[in-house]
Amino acid sequence: MGSGSFDSHAYFSFTSSTAGKATDDIYASRTIHKDLDPKGVKLRESRDSADNPNATPLIVAIDVTGSMGILADVIAREGLGVLFTSILDRKPISDPHVMFMAVGDANCDRAPLQISQFEADNRIVEQLTQIYLEHGGGGNNFESYNAPWYFASFHTAHDSMEKRGKRGYLFTV
């Protein structure tokens, strides 16, 4: 994963095709998608490639509980394009490899953590639409925000750190 580059025209074609559709029509999963299930995942890797010789891992963990579940929809339809084009235009980091995580409630939800691959191109959009928007949570103020941090610490590997001694970035929304 992590080869290719982001095509804003293809992304905006996706957003145009989803305009006016209900969130449930785009996010049709009613259980965790096998490609997003962290169970049994040893590593998710962000590696340098010919297209991205200085890959920088960037993880965006999104709260998908009932009170915040709309964020995944907004990020897929609007925020992803802004994120990628802003990074590519301003260049605060080199060769971004983006991973999305969906965060729920480990006490109440069936899918408290979902993880994409690291992607440098539009494949991230397809993975985003596979997210199971459980809209759960227990109202117990116990969303599992530590789960993405744990996964990133123990189940990711990236050339940015191994070759250049630079850490990646993780944002929890």
Question: How would you describe each model-predicted region?
Answer:
Residues 2-59, 66-73, 77, 85:
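Acidic, polar low-complexity linker/tail segments
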Residues 9, 33, 97, 135, ...:
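Histidine (H) residue identity feature
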Residues 45-49, 109-127, 161-162:
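Short, Lys/Arg-enriched charge-dense amphipathic segments
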Residues 47-52, 89-92, 154-166:
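Surface-exposed acidic, glycine-flexible loop patches that form ligand/cofactor-binding
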Residues 51-117, 120-167:
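Von Willebrand factor
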Residues 170:
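Active-site cradle of extracellular carbohydrate-active enzymes
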Residues 173:
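VWA/integrin I-like adhesion module and closely mimicked acidic/polar interface patches used
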